[in-house]
Amino acid sequence: MTTADRDDRELLDAHVSGDPEAFGELFARHRDRLWAVALRTMGNREDAADALQDALISAFRRAGSFRGDSQVTTWLHRIVVNACLDRLRALKVRQADALPDDLEEHVGRGSTHTISTVEQPDAAALATERRERVLAALATLPADQRAALVLVDMEGYPVADVAVMLDCAVGTVKSRCARGRRRLAALLTEYGVTQVTTEDGNRPPPAAVPPSDAPRGPPS
């Protein structure tokens, strides 16, 4: 059996047993999603790359402590999110610090929902603009709310799995999502974007928080 033929748990066990290729294969399988979580949680590529590196070092060293009471992917995401939150706390990042320097180009000055009647953007341009505004607003949320929304709304994980990743109760995840969505909705109204919310704390329709078009994977 080759390294590529093994499932995640077998790769992790092989890594613990000394297989030099196993962890690299495991990371390669989940690289894009782990990077997406880090990028959306941190708000910029440089900090996301640092947080992901912290997480991978931690996972590499702590693989022997994996108890098997969750999926390996859940365990990896939990380590990545914790690394992001630790770095945010260490850097004392304020809510607005993760906003891009060119935010005004994304959301404009004052009211932003007016579209020129002379030159109407095509659907792709409108979708890109909307996505940028959502991600900019997301970056202003408190770290715990941001992490919950990234995992539930953008990555599509069930609330129960996110509770494991964040090491908190299911009700806490739902509460963080609900508070985050309310704050996000208020910001998006200012930005001229309609935000869909749900009452039960579970994932809203995909259009509510669109995926990022940022390059996949951490910078090489």
Model-derived regions: residue spans:
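Residue-level preference for hydrophobic side chains embedded in well-ordered alpha helices
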Residues: 26, 30, 34, 55, ...
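Short helix-capping/turn signature of helix-turn-helix
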Residues: 29-32, 40-43, 150-158
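Arg/Lys-rich amphipathic alpha helix in sigma70-family domain 2
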Residues: 61-68, 78-99, 108, 127, ...
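Charged, low-cysteine interdomain linkers and short loop/connector segments
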Residues: 94-121
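Helix-turn-helix DNA-binding module
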Residues: 135-147, 151, 155-172
